[in-house]
A protein has these predicted regions:
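Hydrophobic core of transmembrane alpha-helices in multi-pass small-molecule transporters
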Residues: 22, 91, 102-118
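Short amphipathic helix-loop junctions that connect adjacent transmembrane helices
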Residues: 33-49
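Central cavity-lining transmembrane alpha-helices of secondary-active solute carriers
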Residues: 55-70
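Intracellular juxtamembrane helix-capping segments at the cytosolic ends
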Residues: 117-131
Length: 148
């Protein structure tokens, strides 16, 4: 059974949202891989503290979207992504500049908040950019991007 050409057509916002998700995930996983080592060697935490901070960072970035989703709906796609990537840029930029736990904690919080604004926008855009005929394909593309 061949897929119709229209089932592959999505608005530009759909593809932009998926590209944004791909960039956010690449930045998150790239940071998460090195975070514990950074906390140990640069910030000076011990193993337990570094593990706790890294685990908390990972947990919060998945918990906060439950709260930021409503705000993202009110702000809209464009403003939410601008806010999200502004927070992410500030957070990731600050991580490279500071070497004590206070500023590093604030930097990680900015990253968490930025990531929390990206997630609901992307899934909402996948839903709004699709119809009954191509919704499964839209979410398949979205989940493929998330899992790359």
């Amino acid at each position: 059974m061949a897929a119709s050409a229209s089932s592959w057509r999505f608005p530009r916002a759909f593809w932009t949202a998926n590209a944004a998700e791909l960039c956010e995930r690449a930045a998150y996983y790239g940071t998460f891989i090195a975070l514990r080592t950074y906390l140990l060697r640069v910030v000076g935490l011990d193993d337990v503290q570094a593990g706790f901070v890294a685990g908390l960072f990972g947990a919060l970035i998945y918990l906060f979207p439950f709260f930021t989703g409503a705000i993202s709906d009110r702000l809209g796609f464009r403003h939410s992504l601008i806010l999200a990537f502004g927070l992410l840029a500030a957070g990731y930029g600050a991580l490279g500049r500071f070497h004590t736990m206070g500023p590093v904690s604030l930097s990680l919080l900015l990253v968490v908040l930025g990531g929390a604004f990206v997630k609901p926008v992307i899934s909402g855009t996948a839903s709004k950019s699709s119809n009954e005929a191509n919704r499964a394909r839209a979410f398949s593309i979205f989940y493929m991007i998330v899992n790359i």
